[in-house]
Amino acid sequence: MEGTTVIAVRHQGRVALAGDGQVTFGNTVMKHKARKVRRLYQDRVLAGFAGSVADAFTLFEKFEAKLETYHGNLQRAAVELGKEWRTDRFLRRLEALLVVADKEHLLIISGNGEIVEPDDGIAAIGSGGPYALAAARALVAHTSMTAGEIAREAMNIAASICIYTNNNIIVEEL
């Protein structure tokens, strides 16, 4: 997924989700202050996206509806969205990834409906994801920073490497 970076960090009993603000169209930067992370379900769930903006908003709406249906149960809502994503002909064409988290779980929901919960409590998606992931793992292992501080610094490192990621970073924490 070209054009963004989103990272989620679970550390010291907290969870933080951070995303950059850059939106690109081909080789052109179209927007610098997009909001790619948001709070859902009574501010108890964090979600971020990488990929097509229109597709991501469709998935946010679907995921939020699943959260309502399953009373904020993140895992159940993710599994049900994954099932629908795999079986619905329209949804299968959507090009986006979601990273979602609550106080207990952190999940990546992929475009083919797969759901992955990382072992180390760190997940990153988008073109700058590998850089942010590596930075966050190092910061968790070698600093006493908070989850929010780690997410922000990992995003800054990714933005210094990935041309599709800027340093207009929004961090949400639970």
Curated annotation (Swiss-Prot):
Reaction(s) this enzyme catalyzes, per UniProt: ATP-dependent cleavage of peptide bonds with broad specificity
Tell me the InterPro entries matching this sequence: ATP-dep_Prtase_HsIV_su, Ntn_hydrolases_N, Proteasome_sua/b, Proteasome_suB-type
Query: What highest taxon heads this organism's lineage?
Result: Bacteria
Q: Where in the cell is it found?
A: Cytoplasm
Which keywords annotate this record? Allosteric enzyme, Cytoplasm, Hydrolase, Metal-binding, Protease, Sodium, Threonine protease
Q: Which residues bind Na(+)?
A: A159, C162, T165
Known regulation of activity: Allosterically activated by HslU binding.
Q: Which PROSITE patterns match?
A: PROTEASOME_BETA_2
Q: What is its EC number?
A: 3.4.25.2
SUPFAM superfamilies xrefs: N-terminal nucleophile aminohydrolases (Ntn hydrolases)
A biological process (GO) annotation for this entry? proteolysis involved in protein catabolic process
Active site: residue positions: T4
Q: What is its main location?
A: cytoplasm
Q: Which GO terms describe its molecular function?
A: metal ion binding; threonine-type endopeptidase activity
Show the GO cellular component annotation of the record. HslUV protease complex; proteasome core complex
Asked whether the keyword Hydrolase is assigned, the reply is: yes
Q: Which Gene3D superfamilies match?
A: Glutamine Phosphoribosylpyrophosphate, subunit 1, domain 1
- Quaternary assembly: A double ring-shaped homohexamer of HslV is capped on each side by a ring-shaped HslU homohexamer. The assembly of the HslU/HslV complex is dependent on binding of ATP.
Entry similarity comment = Belongs to the peptidase T1B family. HslV subfamily.
NCBIfam families linked:
ATP_dep_HslV (TIGR03692), PRK05456.1 (NF003964)
Q: Which PANTHER family match?
A: ATP-DEPENDENT PROTEASE SUBUNIT HSLV, METALLOPROTEASE TLDD
Q: This protein is called what?
A: ATP-dependent protease subunit HslV
Q: Which gene encodes it?
A: hslV
